[in-house]
UniProtKB/Swiss-Prot annotation:
The keyword Ubl conjugation does not apply. Component of the mitochondrial ribosome (mitoribosome), a dedicated translation machinery responsible for the synthesis of mitochondrial genome-encoded proteins, including at least some of the essential transmembrane subunits of the mitochondrial respiratory chain. The mitoribosomes are attached to the mitochondrial inner membrane and translation products are cotranslationally integrated into the membrane. This is Large ribosomal subunit protein uL5m. Its main location: mitochondrion. Disulfide bonds: none annotated. The gene is mrpl7. Pfam families: Ribosomal_L5_C (PF00673). GO terms for biological process: translation. Belongs to the universal ribosomal protein uL5 family. InterPro entries: Ribosomal_uL5, Ribosomal_uL5_C, Ribosomal_uL5_dom_sf. It comes from Neurospora crassa (strain ATCC 24698 / 74-OR23-1A / CBS 708.71 / DSM 1257 / FGSC 987). GO terms for cellular component: cytosolic large ribosomal subunit; mitochondrion.
């Protein structure tokens, strides 16, 4: 390859210069009375080497020159590839802080390490929610604040140390009661933070899978058909004799779907599965973890109603299809907002 490049360079050196470059001369090399009369000589030695003619005076290319100028034809006739640049940018593997001179590109950049292509489609339920239901949800949760109303400072929820000990001064406040962390505060819904579905986790518990491994295989195949993602096996943490569980042994499987896949799963669940459940009251109103997440379960008979399972029903043994638990994680900050979101999508709730 290097020898070919040397031959091309020597061939270009032997080619005579064209008349186009020979006509244009510098001011210092111009000779003749006509050139001396037409071109005023500069008294400044630094400007003597400058060209006096402008590039705007160059002749306009003719039609023949335009037809002969075909760069695409020259590229097509080139048999060997041009040498590529040796420099290739690789994003950093670790993020060393905002002050480091080398920063990771944003996740939307195709060269980023965490780049995820897409989205490739718009789910029907997601489009309906954003165009129709989002404005209604924001109107239902609207809280009017008159102009000029001073903002209330949030109260301190952590307890201070009380006593005469001098070590209590400037000491961090006490931990909350009943939990290692404080629950999140409920934020008012505005056009900036309308609740949406963030992710959905589908899990199943198969306590008899230790004796009959086929139950775990069927459960994993059912979750794979329902969600379109490969489930991971879950293991029991402790020994439970009543449920025939052993520590660190497979006891079920789970999978989590995000983004458009979560909206499509929710669409099938609301419009194809839940309406066909006989004598189903709905989701208990007492469900929720206080942070905007809602959980409910389905029986084995209800799981069979999913279209992905129903179309290949003969592939799964009827008595081995398990039930499942569905945990819907939303961007809401309270159970009230999460239930309001799911009710607008079509999930019924009931209270005893």
């Amino acid at each position: 390859m290097a020898s070919l490049r040397g031959v091309s360079r020597s061939a270009r050196a032997l080619q005579p210069f064209s008349a186009q470059f020979a006509v244009r001369r510098c001011a210092s090399t111009q000779t003749g009375a006509g050139a001396a009369a037409a071109t005023p000589k500069s008294n400044i030695p630094d400007l003597a080497e400058l060209e006096t003619r402008s590039a705007l005076d160059a002749p306009i290319p003719s039609e023949e020159d335009k037809k002969e100028f075909r760069p695409w034809k020259r590229a097509a006739d080139r048999k060997a590839r041009l040498p590529s640049s040796r420099y290739q940018y690789h994003p950093p593997k670790y993020n060393r802080g905002p002050l480091h001179p080398i920063q990771s590109p944003p996740s939307s950049d195709p060269i980023a390490r965490d780049f995820v292509p897409g989205p490739f489609n718009m789910p029907r339920l997601k489009e309906t929610f954003r165009t129709v239901m989002a404005s209604d949800l924001m109107t239902l949760a609207y809280i009017h604040t008159p102009p000029g109303t001073p903002k209330k400072e949030p109260t301190e929820r952590l307890r201070a140390w009380e006593g005469d000990s001098p070590y209590f001064a400037n000491r961090a406040r006490r931990a909350p009661r009943g939990a290692p962390e404080l629950p999140i505060r409920e934020r008012d819904i505005s056009f900036r933070n309308i609740p949406e579905i963030k992710e959905i986790t589908v899990s199943t518990f198969v306590p008899l899978g230790l004796k009959n491994p086929d139950l775990l295989i069927v459960a994993r195949a059912v979750l794979l058909a329902m969600t379109g993602t490969m489930p991971e096996m879950t293991r029991s943490k402790n020994n439970v004799v009543q449920w025939q569980l052993q520590a660190n042994k497979p006891a079920g499987c789970k999978t989590t779907i995000y983004g458009n896949a979560a909206w499509e799963f929710m669409d099938r669940l609301i419009h194809l599965v839940l309406p066909r459940i006989k004598d189903w009251k709905g989701v208990p109103a007492s469900t929720g973890d206080g942070s905007g997440n809602v959980q409910f379960g389905l029986n084995p008979e209800d799981v069979q109603l999913f279209p992905e399972v129903e179309c290949n029903y003969d592939m799964y043994p009827a008595k081995m299809i398990p039930g499942c638990h569905i945990a819907i994680k939303t961007t809401a900050t309270s159970d009230r907002q999460a239930k309001l979101l799911l009710q607008s999508l079509g999930v019924p709730f009931y209270s005893n």
